[in-house]
């Protein structure tokens, strides 16, 4: 994470590079999906609004946005408004709790999240969990609690919790 003010030309250069990448990926039949990450992970785009500004400036139809509830908990207060603000650029959502655990029982306002997703063209919801018991996987990512010791159980619980929201 950059611990100083970014250079003035960073946003224009980022947008220009993303436009070129979007075109290259389009020719290859691949979508580019970008995820804003919390200020503790990146300085480039921390909020949905910041990522949307970069994508709009890059001005390529092949650039899309993926939001992550783990990063939203740090950067926004109104999840539904943040999700809706991305509009047609929203491709998907990484769903996990504020501690990266199974959805449900934490701080994420799931009814508001799924209500807002229904107002978008979101094509994908994936469950993101990390098993810190696998070598140094979690430690290298700053995840010190093993909130996902059993990936199969994580997915079963996540599906059971979220299924009522998507019907």
What are these regions (language model features)?
Residues 1-64, 74, 145-152:
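Active-site acidic/histidine proton-transfer and metal-coordination neighborhood
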Residues 45-67, 72-167:
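Histidine-acidic metal/acid-base catalytic patches
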């Amino acid at each position: 994470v950059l611990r100083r003010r970014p250079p003035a030309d960073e946003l224009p250069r980022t947008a220009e590079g993303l436009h070129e990448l979007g075109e290259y990926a389009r020719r290859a039949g691949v979508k580019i999906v970008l995820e804003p990450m919390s200020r503790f992970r990146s300085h480039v785009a921390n909020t949905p609004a910041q990522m949307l500004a970069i994508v709009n400036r890059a001005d390529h139809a092949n650039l899309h946005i993926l939001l992550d509830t783990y990063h939203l908990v740090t950067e926004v207060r109104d999840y539904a408004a943040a999700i809706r603000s991305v509009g047609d650029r929203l491709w998907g959502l990484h769903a996990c709790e504020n501690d990266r655990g199974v959805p449900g029982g934490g701080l994420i306002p799931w009814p508001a999240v799924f209500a807002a997703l229904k107002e978008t063209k979101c094509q994908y919801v994936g469950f993101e969990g990390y098993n810190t018991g696998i070598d140094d996987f979690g430690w290298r990512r700053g995840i010190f609690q093993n909130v996902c010791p059993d990936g199969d159980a994580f997915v079963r619980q996540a599906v059971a919790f979220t299924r009522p929201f998507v019907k």
